Regions:
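Amphipathic terminal alpha-helices
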Residues: 111-124
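Residues that recognize and position ribonucleotide moieties
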Residues: 21, 51, 93
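Conserved C-terminal active-site "lid" loop/helix of NAD(P)H-dependent oxidoreductases
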Residues: 25, 56, 60, 79-107
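Mid/C-terminal beta-alpha module of Rossmann-like enzyme folds, strongest
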Residues: 31-85
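Residues within well-ordered alpha-helical secondary structure of globular protein domains
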Residues: 34, 64, 106, 119-122
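A conserved pocket-lining segment of Rossmann-fold NAD(P)-dependent short-chain dehydrogenase/reductase
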Residues: 2-26, 31
Length: 124
């Protein structure tokens, strides 16, 4: 968000169809508790509520909230526009939470990333 403000555009790499998982912090808090109470030692859990949000949708949501445009950028431009996230910007990372939900009975119940960001509290 800060880099989008600074650069005047919310950027994404390529066509923006690559996906990132996300989760509401309140849902993650519940997941941590359930993991401590129920998960077998060494379990691999995926705490994601949104199993894959297109990077272009992420950029559009940020742009709408800031009143700026979006821009597709190259991988070479990514560090300027995305900072440390540039390393991950081109990855397509849809992530299933099926195992986590089944093993722990966990169910994300809070707003997803887009809805949460649209509330505006990340932009104060």
């Amino acid at each position: 968000i800060d880099l989008a403000r600074k650069n005047g555009v919310a950027a994404y790499t390529g066509d923006g169809t690559n996906r990132w998982p996300a989760a509401n912090t309140y849902d993650i808090g519940v997941l941590y508790r359930l993991a401590l109470e129920k998960a077998p030692a060494g379990s691999t859990l995926h705490g994601v509520g949104d199993t894959g949000i297109a990077r272009k949708v992420i950029a559009e949501t940020i742009a709408d909230m800031l009143g700026i445009g979006t821009q597709s950028i190259t991988d070479d431009q990514a560090p300027q526009y995305l900072g440390f996230l540039a390393t991950y910007a081109g990855l397509d990372n849809p992530t299933s939470n099926d195992k986590t939900r089944t093993l722990l009975g966990w169910q994300p119940t809070h707003p997803g990333w887009v809805e949460d960001v649209q509330k505006g509290h990340y932009f104060a």
